[in-house]
Each structure stands twice: as structure tokens, then as C-alpha cells.
Curated annotation (Swiss-Prot):
The keyword Secreted applies. Residues 1-22 form the signal peptide. Keywords: Amphibian defense peptide, Secreted, Signal. Its main location: secreted. One of its GO terms (biological process) is defense response. Expressed by the skin glands. Belongs to the frog skin active peptide (FSAP) family. Dermaseptin subfamily. InterPro entries: Frog_antimicrobial_propeptide, FSAP. This is Preprofallaxidin-4. It comes from the Eukaryota. GO terms for cellular component: extracellular region. It comes from Litoria fallax.
Amino acid sequence: MASLKKFLFLVLFLGMVSLSICDKEKREGENEEEEEEHEEESEEKRGLFSFLPKVIGVIGPLIHPPS
């Protein structure tokens, strides 16, 4: 009976450790995905802001022609 208790305790302990490791890896994966999404958004914003002055440079003279 004592050996059965030890065996069950060992199985339970190893299962909990395994779950803990899996949860940790899952959280790390989610964090990496969030960082990648944030980087993509930053690149899109930079692209927009680099393009915006060119558009203003073209439209500006059309709206306010030189006198």
C-alpha cells in the first residue's frame, strides 16, 4: 500500500511539473507573437509617416499656389 502511494505521488508530481513547463512555454510563445505584432504595427506607422511628407509636398502647392 505504501509503495502504491509513493508511485501515485510520483506520477502526480511529474504530471504537475510537466504541465508547469508546458504552460511556461505557451506563455513565452504568446509573448513572442505579441512582440511580432507590435513590431509589424511600428513598421506600418513608420512607413506611413515617411510617406506623409511626400504627399503633403505634392498637395501643398496645389492647395496654396504661389502668388
